[in-house]
């Protein structure tokens, strides 16, 4: 791990209980330029070869989440560790295994150190669905979940959840449902990525969700219920 300190941080106002995974369409050099230009940061940056850069001390509040919400909490900068991944297509093409292996090692270390629950390892698009598309449809959530990082689901467990309303399910999982369409798309990107079309990086950054979402609603409700079961069990 290499230390490259950024000055864009301040003091935390809450203890660490969440990991937020991001990606950006830059290599390390351009990522650092972008951080400086926009006066933002993350605690860690992982390049495509799996090299980890520590940019902000974990005990400090990095400026990575922006306007955000998850399970009733706003401003996730306060209570989270932010990890950025270099991804030229903004998470729309497969991540190199070396990069994912490095991420897994880092997340497992942080999870043990701060006693982070697996369901509190989430993506930037989960906490900011109207603004952000990362870490993208190609991020291997299922692969990480098999290693105790984040959650995945079994559709058979949907029948164990009585709730049927989409908005209520999204809210119980953790999403900000002020814009239900954006929350729905963020959920689909995370848990049903096969339904997410590939787009240009420019378009994704302009608007990370479509105005109209065509999806098999019974399948969506089933998946929502199955995910909620994993959180509540």
Predicted regions mapped to residue ranges:
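Active-site-adjacent loop/helix surface patches within enzyme catalytic domains
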Residues: 1-120
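Basic/polar, cationic surfaces and motifs that engage anionic cell-wall
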Residues: 89, 95-233
């Amino acid at each position: 791990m290499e230390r490259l300190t950024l000055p864009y941080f301040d003091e935390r106002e809450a203890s660490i209980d969440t990991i937020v995974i991001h990606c950006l369409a830059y290599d390390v050099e351009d990522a650092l330029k972008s951080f400086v230009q926009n006066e933002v940061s993350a605690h860690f940056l992982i390049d495509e070869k799996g090299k980890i850069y520590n940019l902000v001390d974990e005990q400090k509040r990095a400026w990575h989440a922006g306007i955000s919400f998850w399970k009733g909490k706003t401003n996730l900068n306060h209570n989270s560790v932010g990890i950025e991944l270099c991804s030229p297509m903004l998470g729309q093409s497969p991540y190199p295994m070396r990069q994912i292996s490095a991420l897994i090692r880092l997340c497992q270390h942080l999870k043990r150190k701060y006693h982070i629950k697996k369901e509190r390892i989430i993506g930037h698009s989960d906490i900011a669905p109207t603004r952000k598309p990362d870490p993208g449809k190609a991020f291997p959530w299922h692969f990480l979940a098999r290693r105790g990082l984040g959650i995945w689901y079994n559709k058979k467990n949907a029948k164990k959840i009585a709730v049927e309303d989409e908005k209520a399910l999204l809210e119980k999982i953790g999403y900000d449902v002020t814009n239900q369409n954006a929350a729905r798309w963020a959920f689909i990107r995370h848990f049903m990525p096969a339904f997410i079309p590939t787009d240009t990086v420019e378009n994704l950054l302009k608007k990370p969700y479509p105005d109209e979402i065509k999806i098999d609603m019974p399948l969506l409700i089933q998946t929502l219920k199955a995910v909620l079961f994993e959180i509540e069990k």
